[in-house]
Amino acid sequence: MAPPRTNNRPVTRRKKPSNLLLLLKEKYVNWNFIKYLAFEPAALPIVSVLIVLAEAVINVLVIQRVPYTEIDWKAYMQECEGFLNGTTNYSLLRGDTGPLVYPAAFVYIYSGLYYLTGQGTNVRLAQYIFACIYLLQMCLVLRLYTKSRKVPPYVLVLSAFTSYRIHSIYVLRLFNDPVAILLLYAALNLFLDQRWTLGSICYSLAVGVKMNILLFAPALLLFYLANLGVLRTLVQLTICAVLQLFIGAPFLRTHPMEYLRGSFDLGRIFEHKWTVNYRFLSKELFEQREFHLVLLALHLLLLLCFAKPTWTFFRSYLRLREVQQQIVPQILHKNREQQNQAKIQAKKSKQLVEQQQEEEDEQLSAEQKSFLKAFERSLQQSTGQKSLEPHLNQKQEQYDIYFEPCTQLALLPFFLCNFIGVACARSLHYQFYIWYFHSLPYLVWSTPYSLGVRYLILGIIEYCWNTYPSTMESSIALHLCHLILLVGVARHVYRILRLNATVKQQQRQEQSTLQNGQPKTSKKSQ
């Protein structure tokens, strides 16, 4: 009995995937690719996916294994229950921890959570909802870092995975700060995508959840003016204001003064026992109005000091975006032309090869042709490889310019403006850490300091926020880190301004030299 003719087929099928696995192993399982993932900001799209997946696992483990701590959740539910029962007087909406002090968007969002969690009793479900909020915010934050290509991926990995306080704030405390920060980062992403109206809506909603989002307002105003001009800026500010009136309407119609005093109380006194940054002050000095006015004056002074760099950065960002809008269509057109030319060339080459093949076939006898084909098939079966064919469609190099790093010019002023507000705050409570946590790596990498100093700043800040209760030493260390970080960013920013001024001066000198030289050359020619 003749042996079966299909003995070699399984061999060829096994070798194809093994070859593919070898190629993947050679390309990705090596030290160079690991270094690329760790240190190259261009690898952030890949690393971001890994971070989000790992964070999902970490949050589930924290929820399952670490006990929940009740602080404000019940009070939030009690305040919302009063609203749902028909009370629109803010002075009457209270919980176990005190009166309601947040704007109307907070009331609506937590009223939704009130229903979803069975009047606030299903805390475990609320924890998983806040875990989703955390993951969604991480996606928005990582998108900004991916666009800017400023910070190495390993820094974001370390900062995300090593902060117990941040995970605690989101899934073990259920504060309203995460909701406000989520809307804030959604607004920043929309602004950078030039979706101004949606960005303004998200920003206004964030302010409607918690008033600390106003710390970004000075930078946002300049960003509006630099990109939109005065009239369109007024339109966006009107959108923000109208949305605040709309969400506050049930309270403004009935008890307007109580709503404004309760939700936008700029003079509210914080309790000294919860302060993270001013433990070294006495309670009397901490609560003095003069001390608050000094901090406000310092805040405004620092904003004025950085107003010119902020405006310069925003204008430079706008100019680069305009260049992008001019160049990108040209690049796309050039690439399409190349592709069309490549297709035409490939078609001509294919016709030429077929013509040559026909000429060669005419010179061979039928017996020779069959012998060559049989020999080729036997080689394919023994090696598991296909016959080599001429590469008619070789991949053409395409033109491309990556413009997204220009978002560095927009992000730094936003993060810096918020950081100044946090550093000059009358008091910082533990949940306020998320106000600037996700921007700290960006700010630290915007300083001229060495890597060791950068790690030290991030490490000490994390230590200060994890010290409970706060001590004199931890509060002083936090202020020192804020000061060192602010000085470093200022050095970086003003160095860029000096370089910019030098380049402009050189350009003016070159232009004046050319203008002065033109009459002389014309006289010589005459």
UniProtKB/Swiss-Prot annotation:
Pfam families named in the record: ALG3
Protein name: Dolichyl-P-Man:Man5GlcNAc2-PP-dolichol alpha-1,3-mannosyltransferase Alg3
Transmembrane segments: 43-63, 98-118, 125-145, 171-191, 211-231, 232-252, 294-314, 405-425, 432-452, 470-490
Positions on the Cytoplasmic side per record topology: 1-42, 119-124, 192-210, 253-293, 426-431, 491-526
Pathway(s) the chain acts in: Protein modification; protein glycosylation
Keyword terms, alphabetized: Developmental protein, Endoplasmic reticulum, Glycosyltransferase, Membrane, Transferase, Transmembrane, Transmembrane helix, Tumor suppressor
GO terms of molecular function: dol-P-Man:Man(5)GlcNAc(2)-PP-Dol alpha-1,3-mannosyltransferase activity
Residue intervals on the Lumenal side: 64-97, 146-170, 315-404, 453-469
